[in-house]
Swiss-Prot record:
The keyword Cell inner membrane applies. Changing E157Q: Partially complements for vancomycin resistance in M.smegmatis. InterPro entries: MFS, MFS_dom, MFS_trans_sf, Sugar_transporter_CS. Belongs to the major facilitator superfamily. P55 (TC 2.A.1.3.34) family. One of its GO terms (molecular function) is lipid binding. GO terms for cellular component: plasma membrane. Keywords: Cell inner membrane, Cell membrane, Lipid transport, Lipid-binding, Membrane, Transmembrane, Transmembrane helix, Transport. It comes from Mycolicibacterium hassiacum (strain DSM 44199 / CIP 105218 / JCM 12690 / 3849). In association with lipoprotein LprG transports triacylglycerides (TAG) across the inner cell membrane, probably transfering them to lipoprotein LprG in the periplasm. TAG probably regulates lipid metabolism and growth regulation and plays a structural role in the outer membrane. Mutagenesis and molecular modeling suggests TAG (and maybe other lipids) enters the central cavity of the P55 transporter from within the cell inner membrane via clefts on the cytoplasmic face of P55 between TM5-TM8 and TM2-TM11. From there the lipid is probably transferred to the hydrophobic cavity of LprG. This is Triacylglyceride transporter MHAS_02168/C731_2106. Residues 40-60, 108-111, 168-177, 231-243, 301-320, 365-384, 441-487 are periplasmic.
Amino acid sequence: MAFPQTPNRLIRPRRTSRGIAISAGGLAVLLGALDTYVVVSIVTDIMRDVGIAVNQIQRVTPIITGYLLGYIAAMPLLGRASDRFGRKLLIQISLAGFALGSVITALATNLDVLVAGRVIQGAASGALLPVTLALAADLWATHKRAAVLGGVGAAQELGAVLGPIYGIFVVWLFHHWQAVFWVNVPLALIAMVLIHISLPPRVRTEEPQRVDVTGGLLLALALGLATIGLYNAEPDGKQVLPEYGPPLIIGAVIAAVAFLVWERFARTRLLDPAGVRFRPFLIALLVSLVTGGALMVTLVNVELFGQGVLGLDQDEAVFLLARFLIALPVGALLGGWIATRVGDRAVTAVGLLIAAGGFYLIAQWPADVLESRHDLGFVSLPTLDTDLAIAGFGLGLVIAPLTSAALRVVPAAQHGIASAAVVVARMIGMLIGIAALSAWGLYRFNQYLKEQLAALPPAPADFPGGQMAGQMMRLRTATVQAYVLQYGEIFAITAGLCVFGAVLGLFIAGRREHAEESADAVDGVSNARDRAPSA
């Protein structure tokens, strides 16, 4: 007989204890998210101390790719390990690993050691988000968990907003970039203590679950190769992938095929298909992939629009994203709260339609968008600020209900790997989205530039400053218009992808769809076997 995942079958800690536990988990997620973005504001300080010239900034790319490598590659295996060994132990191990990686990074005097520290940080941080999401699913009933998942998602997105500012503030306060990583140590210890006191020890089951280490390593290899192969530090350059990208992508495909073959015949699998409702689960992963692509396209192309069209320097162009990044966590919090009342499907579909509307508006941006406004009759709103906020808010709304729907159709014993799958799908969507649209954008830019140059008359011989100056002005005008058309097309495609995601969102798990699992399976879940405190 099958049983749904009902809260009365799971032994949970008291409300106060679980509040402390999820707050500590949220702190851990925020720490990991901050460290993802913090290097943006301190990279020049790091370069100086490890002996890299300012004009060789491409050499510090491994600092970023190393973190992403650890983050994405380790996530599925560590998420599954939390199903086997319990959320409490995995969060504490991950926090300890994060602190260790921070110490190694802070002590680094050369690039190799620095990258090693960042890889360790990334691997530890990669476990924190999915395991905390799974912990929220363990501690809250199905119909209430979306709001909590929204809070965890908001902590993740808040890191993107505060990361660069946090780095600048810590360096200003302590006068050296190493302090950014030293501060992680006491904060990680605080989170470990809070997790320790708020979650009781895990009760060992008579038949503990096995972990598919081989499958996890094959998947980690595939994801790691794909991460490095797809990540291009200069997406506005002359090539979409880095020079070493194509062979790594081929290697990733081979590793992925090997993983699928292994999972087909292995007795112990990374994701046990028993009880999983694959149709809604895979649809949730596909929607997560779409949202990741839309997110990354925005993060990269808004900055490039600021530099190429508006003539802003890099710092000013990055600041344009503040409107989008602030709206993301706001949407995540509100989306979780609304989903507990109206359901995951509705919020996911509406959120992506709102995002599509925002991206459609962004696609209409003129070259003088900073002076442009939306005249609504009773009020006039700045175009750039409004459009970015709408897109960010819409994508934020989707975070909690998407995770909630995915977890609901996977047995509770596999919430760790399921949470990791949702996050990995989003990250892969980010990498694929920017690579694909960069290729398309580069192709279209060259076409548009030729068209614009053909439409503009040649500079007259009596042009002020000379004919050469006139030709430069002509090229600049054509280039700006080509950029406007290129980015307009990219964001229009992104709007279409969000509409596609909204349609898919109508087919994720509804409120009454649950994984099929036996009573023994529910009672045997490692994370649900934590005993309530005696006090």
